[in-house]
């Protein structure tokens, strides 16, 4: 404390420890009971500074910047201590600088921090002046740290530092020992380190918060203008899930370049697509989609429904070796198909007419059918050219509308059955020994021309009953023709020779029937029409047609040899009129 005597000279007295402790308690009491608002701090500081400088000329100003903390409870202590005139030499300049920096950073938004000059008069203006290297450095923005959650902790540390500096100044004023000053300096240094670490923590967290609040840095997305202003690439999975890509519009130059590239290759690789995208200022994904759409347009135009791993349905047909089928073979197959269609149509028409009881002339029916279809343009003369292929009207290998099987094929042994019911000759005594072989399972006689060994349509020369199945009265279209002895001998010779087989699958039935007919001497000549009459060709003169057993066995052996030749795989395929081997074999 400063005491003035009546003589007017000022003397300093050292008070005892009790007085000093009382002064310290008084200071702490002032710290606890202070309720000043932050807005009053600069005004009080200004008044205290002016009062101390005017009333006590020799008094020294204290570093009041320590106590300029926003809302700190040490503002009253700064006023009372500054009125005592503490010497500036008692406070370390570095500590004062650190405390002012902390106070400037942690000040709230509404508090104006005074400049450096009035508080730091240390006698070294070149270093600590307003334009010095310490004070000229930029400091943190006080507004950015005002609302930070760590500002209260930093304010508490700065308040503790201010209290330490106040006690240090009072100790210097009362003349404390050097050891006490060293202890106070150590505590001051510790507080300064705590404040510095707090400031560093605040700065680090502020930088992290700013980095998180900023938009992500990076180059702008390519082609965002053509995607309707949406950021990011349209192929990104996360962005594609949130939004829909807008339609891409190509200009004429881009379309010309894409068409030129498509004419060179319908399936460009990734490198070619990337080069096109860079040159045309497009995305690679848009180029790939354009090529997909262009290929789909080509397939739609050519009607090629191509699936994965197989050629288009209208591709050029190939053989098993992979080479295309020759044109002449294709033409031969087409002609055979048309002839088969013609024969089936005529046969169907003939059956309809026979069902109505009308006598059918197949040649006239065929000529009428061809003339009608020539007028329509669906038939031509080239379709009638015979390539040496025998056309089976019934369709021996193809399924027809009637359920035929090989089980009923031995029954079809009749001659060329057909129309009216002419009688085949006298006496009905032999009718019991004759076979009704011109009938199908349902009693229809229109298929009687499909006897074994034949192969032509009704009315054709090959549809006449073979000589081994005819008697003296041959039945053809319900009309009987008498035969003389020479013709009978020729028919007998032809009967002994084996006949070529059109369908080898029925060879066993033919062989068995031939041997049984030769042994028993049966001749079947019955043909039944759909009319009321039946044409019975009865057997006459059995002794003229009986054969010796030796000739029967010889003919059977010849038939077996022919059967072995005819049932080989190649011969079977050649005998099929619609097979490739048959077409090639007949063309040569």
UniProtKB/Swiss-Prot annotation:
Signal peptide: none annotated. Its main location: nucleus. Residues 243-302 bind DNA. Residues 56-65 have a biased composition (Polar residues). GO terms for molecular function: DNA-binding transcription factor activity, RNA polymerase II-specific; sequence-specific double-stranded DNA binding. Belongs to the paired homeobox family. Unc-4 subfamily. This is Homeobox protein unc-4. It comes from Drosophila melanogaster (Fruit fly). The gene is unc-4.
